[in-house]
From Swiss-Prot:
InterPro entries: Acyl_CoA_acyltransferase, Autoind_synth_CS, Autoind_synthase. The gene is phzI. Belongs to the autoinducer synthase family. GO terms for molecular function: N-acyl homoserine lactone synthase activity. It comes from Pseudomonas fluorescens. This is Acyl-homoserine-lactone synthase. It catalyses: a fatty acyl-[ACP] + S-adenosyl-L-methionine = an N-acyl-L-homoserine lactone + S-methyl-5'-thioadenosine + holo-[ACP] + H(+). The lineage of its organism: Bacteria, Pseudomonadati, Pseudomonadota, Gammaproteobacteria, Pseudomonadales. Keywords: Antibiotic biosynthesis, Autoinducer synthesis, Quorum sensing, S-adenosyl-L-methionine, Transferase. Required for the synthesis of a yet unknown N-aceyl-homoserine lactone (N-aceyl-HSL), an autoinducer molecule which binds to PhzR and thus regulates phenazine production. Its EC number is 2.3.1.184. GO terms for biological process: antibiotic biosynthetic process; quorum sensing; signal transduction.
Length: 196
């Protein structure tokens, strides 16, 4: 697996199509998310938060196919937590230059998730983030716990499209998490190189 950081403006048309198609496959087709996709974007998933303020982490396999993605947005710019899920926070959604939102995080294979997660945190921290916020479902919350990710809940669990979700906040610095080392099954040299 090879990981790269991209800005929307720097992506060529082919890469944009690949990412939009991958997100649609993962979120709409696989997970069944009901998203407002315009007719001219059928088969592709984008939203109003895909702007020049977003940074994208993309994971590729040896055939240059996308197998994972994540989106980072500073909370000083429009973001999903503030614009759609503010009711998931007990108080006002975080809004600070050092707090970034991570959304549209997904991988084709489960074993790719934590390498991409750590790489996303590293990208955010190098860009000036101290903390990451986002929405997770109960499955992802359990996955974070299993993998030693320390986080705090920003509010109570709420129902959204027949799913339990909650807003969380976590450190953008890998050393603050108990699972800072990859599980032994995932410690190939290639993965360690990408996530160091």
């Amino acid at each position: 697996m090879h990981m790269e950081e991209h800005a929307l403006s720097a992506m060529d048309d082919e890469l944009k199509l690949m990412l939009g198609r991958f997100r649609h496959e993962q979120f709409v087709e696989k997970l069944g998310w009901r998203l407002p996709i315009p007719p001219h974007q059928a088969g592709y998933e984008w939203d109003q938060y895909d702007t020049e303020h977003a940074r994208y982490l993309l994971a590729f396999n040896e055939h240059r196919s996308i197998v994972g993605c994540a989106r980072l947005i500073p909370t000083t710019f429009p973001n999903l937590l503030e614009g759609v899920f503010s009711h998931a926070c007990a108080g006002a959604p975080p809004r600070h230059p050092a707090i970034w939102e991570m959304t549209r995080f997904t991988t084709r294979e489960p074993q790719l998730a934590m390498p991409l997660f750590w790489k996303t945190l590293k990208t955010a921290s190098l860009a000036g983030a101290d903390a990451i916020v986002g929405i997770v479902n109960s499955t992802m919350e359990r996955y974070y716990k299993i993998n030693g990710v320390k986080y705090e809940r920003l509010g109570s669990v709420i129902d959204h499209q027949n799913e339990k979700i909650l807003a969380i906040k976590l450190s953008a610095h890998r050393e603050h998490h108990r699972g800072a080392r990859l599980p032994s099954g995932f410690t190939s040299e290639a993965l360690l190189e990408e996530t160091a």
